């Protein structure tokens, strides 16, 4: 059975890049009637925190990316926290050492740094020089007796080529002479990502590894490990990373925010999944799609090799589409029941049909609740200056027109046009700003029907001051 996986490290909050990787793996699994697995890679003991672990799971559930295997689900291949799997890794270290495919390395960080510096100055790529590769058993025991704690290095075969087919990038070839022997166990006994990640994928039956292109150079090393241990090898696919509009790595200065922050600001999960699913993946449909529909249209061959540029406006577009299709009860649950309670029952339906198409966030709903039912508007300086420049006569005539025609906006506007000889923006804009405090928004005629007549009068009088 096809099985994909998402393997976050609980060293921080989930960001858009993490979320997209999780989403693609989820959609990939669902498109093949496969299994989506969650594994927590918490081998970085100092930086891994339980709060981040819980936060990652909460974010995944909020995005409706439910895993079928992993913590709290099917745990048949567990444990699913790497910090609890050290005995498993130790067993495979022993196998590699016994087969002479791994050896202890006593080189200090300073020695390694100097070696890399010499290699770079000679125009060579930095790789391990093999200082400890041929130590005899006696030399190894002597160094251990001196109290030196060795790391463990994988013995990379010379003069070979590692070849694999990447589902996104096609055939990939790596010369083993360019790789060099690499560390698979640190001197303190802990396991680095590269080793335990490969072991766990094999033991947990992961058939497809879909991850960021920043892991591409890890793949030949992991293939060498798996082949040496005669473990099953998954199929790999390396997706392009998300970058800012300027092509630089995505950061907060581009408007990128963590999933928790987006959720707290009122973004909806379906908006996020519709945006992220199209960020580096082509969909023929430009309509809002359910997760099931996104999965049905997902194809690894439709993943782009080029970096995916983050666009905050596109994210907000999908947010607006999602809000617009919310059932009324869900809309109020999202916007807040305290806002709903401020709306008279007899005006609730009209308010909803008027405001909903113009709302992207709960703060938008709160704004229009205040416009329709609040006492005062907080005008910006430029708006106040525009009202002053319009002159009192405009608002006096508007006041009289509302008295004469009631809430018939067309008649009010015709009256102003006739009395003041105005047209276009000078005719409409001052009235909209005086009544709503905004230059754009829902249809003014409908907003006027929602407002109390007294509110309309008061705002026109305030505009005259």
Curated annotation (Swiss-Prot):
Subunit details: Monomer.
Sequence motif 'KMSKS' region, location on chain: 249-253
Protein name as annotated: Glutamate--tRNA ligase 1
Family per similarity comment: Belongs to the class-I aminoacyl-tRNA synthetase family. Glutamate--tRNA ligase type 1 subfamily.
PROSITE patterns: AA_TRNA_LIGASE_I
GO cellular component, one term: cytosol
GO MF annotation, one: ATP binding
Binding site for ATP: 252
Matching Gene3D superfamilies: 1.10.10.350, HUPs
Enzyme Commission identifier(s): 6.1.1.17
Top class in the EC scheme: ligase
Organism field: Coxiella burnetii (strain Dugway 5J108-111)
Signal sequence annotation: none
Regions crossing the membrane: none
Keyword field: Aminoacyl-tRNA synthetase, ATP-binding, Cytoplasm, Ligase, Nucleotide-binding, Protein biosynthesis
Encoding gene (name): gltX1
Reaction equation(s) it catalyzes: tRNA(Glu) + L-glutamate + ATP = L-glutamyl-tRNA(Glu) + AMP + diphosphate
């Amino acid at each position: 059975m096809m099985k994909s996986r998402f393997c976050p490290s609980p060293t921080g909050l989930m960001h858009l890049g993490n979320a997209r990787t999780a989403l693609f793996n989820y959609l990939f699994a669902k498109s093949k009637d496969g299994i989506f697995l969650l594994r927590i890679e918490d081998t970085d003991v100092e930086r891994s925190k339980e709060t981040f672990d819980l936060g990652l799971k909460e974010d995944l559930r909020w995005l409706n990316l439910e895993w079928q295997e992993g913590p709290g689900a099917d745990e048949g291949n567990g444990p699913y926290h790497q910090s609890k799997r050290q005995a498993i890794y130790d067993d495979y270290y022993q196998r590699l050492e016994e087969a002479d495919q791994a050896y202890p390395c006593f080189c200090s960080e300073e020695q390694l740094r100097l070696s890399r510096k010499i290699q770079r100055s000679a125009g060579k790529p930095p790789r391990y020089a093999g200082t400890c590769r041929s130590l005899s058993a006696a030399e190894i025991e002597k160094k251990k007796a001196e109290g030196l704690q060795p790391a463990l290095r994988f013995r990379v075969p010379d003069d070979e080529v590692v070849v694999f087919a990447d589902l996104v990038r096609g055939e990939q070839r790596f010369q083993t002479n360019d790789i060099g022997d690499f560390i698979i166990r640190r001197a303190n006994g802990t396991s680095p990502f590269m080793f335990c990640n490969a072991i766990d994928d094999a033991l947990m039956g992961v058939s497809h590894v879909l991850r960021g292109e920043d892991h591409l150079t890890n793949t030949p090393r992991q293939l060498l490990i798996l082949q040496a241990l005669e473990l099953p090898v998954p199929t790999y696919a390396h997706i392009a990373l998300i970058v800012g509009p300027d092509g630089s790595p995505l950061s907060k200065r581009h408007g990128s925010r963590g999933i928790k922050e987006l959720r707290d600001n009122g973004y909806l999960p379906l908006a996020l999944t519709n945006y992220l699913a199209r960020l580096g993946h082509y969909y023929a449909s430009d309509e809002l799609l359910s997760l099931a529909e996104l999965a049905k249209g997902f194809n690894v061959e439709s993943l782009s090799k080029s970096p995916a540029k983050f666009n905050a406006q596109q994210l907000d577009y999908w947010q607006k589409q999602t809000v617009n299709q919310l059932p009324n009860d869900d809309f109020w649950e999202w916007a807040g029941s305290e806002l709903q309670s401020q709306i008279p029952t007899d005006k609730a339906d009209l308010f909803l049909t008027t405001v909903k198409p113009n709302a992207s966030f709960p703060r938008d709903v709160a704004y229009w609740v205040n416009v329709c039912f609040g006492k005062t508007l907080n005008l910006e300086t430029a708006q106040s200056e525009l009202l002053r420049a319009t002159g009192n006569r405009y608002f006096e005539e508007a006041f009289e027109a509302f008295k004469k025609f009631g809430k018939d906006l067309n008649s009010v506007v015709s009256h102003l046009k006739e009395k003041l000889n105005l047209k276009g923006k000078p005719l409409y804009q001052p009235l909209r700003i005086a009544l709503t405090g905004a230059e754009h928004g829902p249809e003014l005629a409908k907003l006027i029907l929602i407002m109390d007549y007294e509110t309309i009068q008061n705002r026109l009088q305030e505009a005259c001051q």
